[in-house]
UniProtKB/Swiss-Prot annotation:
Its cofactor is [4Fe-4S] cluster. [4Fe-4S] cluster 2 binds at C21, C48, C51, C54. GO terms for cellular component: photosystem I; plasma membrane-derived thylakoid membrane. [4Fe-4S] cluster 1 binds at C11, C14, C17, C58. This is Photosystem I iron-sulfur center. GO terms for biological process: photosynthetic electron transport in photosystem I.
Length: 81
C-alpha cells in the first residue's frame, strides 16, 4: 500500500526525521525558508512503510513531516465510507 509523506514549511531543517527513517525515504534539500538553509524532502515515498518514526522524531510542535497511511489519505479526501 502506498503512503503519502508531506513536508510542511514549519520544517526547521534539523535532519531528525531523515536520520529516524529506516528506509531513507527522506533527504534534505536546500531551502532559504529557514535558518538551517535546508528542508526535508520525500523523493522515495514508494519505499515508505508507514512506521511514522519521522513524525516521532520531529521536534517542532507542528509536526513538520506527516505520514498519511493509505486509509488516512482516502479518509482525508472524503472518499472512505
Amino acid at each position: 500500500m502506498s503512503h503519502s509523506v508531506k513536508i510542511y514549511d514549519t520544517c526547521i531543517g534539523c535532519t531528525q526525521c531523515v536520520r529516524a527513517c529506516p528506509l531513507d525515504v527522506l533527504e534534505m534539500v536546500p531551502w532559504d525558508g529557514c535558518k538551517a538553509g535546508q528542508i526535508a524532502s520525500s523523493p522515495r515515498t514508494e519505499d515508505c512503510i508507514g512506521c511514522k518514526r519521522c513524525e516521532t522524531a520531529c521536534p517542532t510542535d507542528f509536526l513538520s513531516v506527516r505520514v498519511y497511511l493509505g486509509a488516512e489519505t482516502t479518509r482525508s479526501m472524503g472518499l472512505a465510507y
